[in-house]
Swiss-Prot record:
It is found in: Cytoplasm. The keyword Cytoplasm applies. The keyword Cytoplasm applies. Pfam families: RimP_N. Required for maturation of 30S ribosomal subunits. This is Ribosome maturation factor RimP. The gene is rimP. GO terms for cellular component: cytosol. Coiled coil: none annotated.
């Protein structure tokens, strides 16, 4: 079976000098290798092709046959690694929490342990008849986040 760590090393070494970074390497049954990349500027098809050829030059198909797919994460794909979070600062996110609640807001800051979102809540001021929008900062611990996606 193809070694996932070997593929991660090959990809990480190849990408070490550029803006493109590794998001995920998955190996599915039948030796189907899926490599996902991302970049602040987006990933072009030429980068995917070049990386695919580099991986093929490093992993011998004669020893073990495999299917290789190299692509970029979609704009609405869930955020998986810290660099994706960092690239989304000042972007609108939809964050699904482990308790089932959903928060939507602008990402202000990100750290390994927590994020800070700017959310708009409808709040009824004391003595007022109607609720008014109020901007609030919400800190969410990373462990409480089930999934987060960019809102386009």
């Amino acid at each position: 079976m193809i070694d996932r760590e070997q593929i991660v090393r090959i990809v990480s070494d190849y990408l070490s000098t550029g803006e493109t970074f590794l998001v995920e390497v998955a190996i599915h049954p039948g030796n189907r290798i899926l490599v996902e990349l991302d970049s602040a500027q987006g990933v072009c098809i030429d980068e995917c092709v070049a990386l695919s050829r580099h991986i093929e030059s490093q992993v011998d198909r004669d020893i073990e046959d495999y299917e290789l797919e190299v692509g970029s994460t979609g704009l609405t794909s869930p955020l998986k690694v810290m660099r994706q979070w960092e690239n989304c600062i000042d972007s609108e996110l939809s964050v699904l929490l482990t308790n089932g609640m959903k928060e939507t807001g602008r990402l202000i800051t990100v750290a390994p342990e927590a994020i800070k979102l700017e959310v708009v809540r409808m709040v009824k001021p004391e003595g007022a008849k109607r609720k008014k929008p109020e901007t609030q900062e919400l800190t969410i611990v990373m462990a409480d986040i089930k999934q987060a996606v960019r809102i386009i």
